[in-house]
Amino acid sequence: MPRRRVVGQRKILPDPKFHSELLAKFINVIMQDGKKSTAEKIIYKALDVVAEKKSENHLVILEAALDNVRPSVEVKSRRVGGSTYQVPCEVRPVRRNALAMRWLVEAARKRGEKSMALRLAGEMLDASENKGTAVKKREDVHRMAEANKAFAHYRW
C-alpha cells in the first residue's frame, strides 16, 4: 500500500466540435510536436471524408473501426528460470482503447494516399469493415497469444 494519496486519472476535456471524449483522445494520439490544431484539422477532415463515402454517422464508423481494432489479449514477456516466455494476458479496457487508437494511426501513416486525413479516413473505413493493416495487427497479437496459451499459468 502506498503511504501517499494515490493520484486519480485526469478527466479529458471533450473535443470542441463534436463534444466527444473519445475523439479528444484520438486527437491527442494523432498530435505531433504539440500541434493540436493541426491534429484537429486532420481528424475533422478525415471524418468529413468518411461522411461523404458512407451514409452512416461518422462517429459511429469511428467507434466501429476502434471496436474492430481493440485487442482482448496480448503477450507480455516473463522471465522464468533463465528463459523468457511470452505469457498471454488480458488487456485492461483503457489500454485496449489506447492500443486501438495507436494502431489505427500507425496503419494510417503507412498508407499511400496524399494527405494524412485521406489516409486516416481510408484506414477507418477499412477497419470498420474488418479489414486493413490495423485489424491485421490485432489479429497478429491474438494469434501470438493463442500460440503461447501453454504459458498462461505464468500469469501474474
UniProtKB/Swiss-Prot annotation:
Under the heading PROSITE patterns, the entry gives: RIBOSOMAL_S7 (PS00052)
Signal peptide start and end residues: none
For this protein, what is any one GO molecular function term? Answer: structural constituent of ribosome
Show the InterPro entries listed in the entry: Ribosomal_uS7 (IPR000235), Ribosomal_uS7_bac/org-type (IPR005717), Ribosomal_uS7_CS (IPR020606), Ribosomal_uS7_dom (IPR023798), Ribosomal_uS7_dom_sf (IPR036823)
Q: Which GO terms describe its cellular component?
A: small ribosomal subunit
Keywords, A to Z, come to: Ribonucleoprotein, Ribosomal protein, RNA-binding, rRNA-binding, tRNA-binding
Q: Name one GO biological process term.
A: translation
- Its transmembrane ranges are none
Q: Which Pfam families match?
A: Ribosomal_S7
Function according to Swiss-Prot or TrEMBL? One of the primary rRNA binding proteins, it binds directly to 16S rRNA where it nucleates assembly of the head domain of the 30S subunit. Is located at the subunit interface close to the decoding center, probably blocks exit of the E-site tRNA.
User: Can you state the subunit structure given in the record?
Assistant: Part of the 30S ribosomal subunit. Contacts proteins S9 and S11.
Q: Which family does it belong to?
A: Belongs to the universal ribosomal protein uS7 family.
This chain's protein is named Small ribosomal subunit protein uS7
Its encoding gene is what?
rpsG
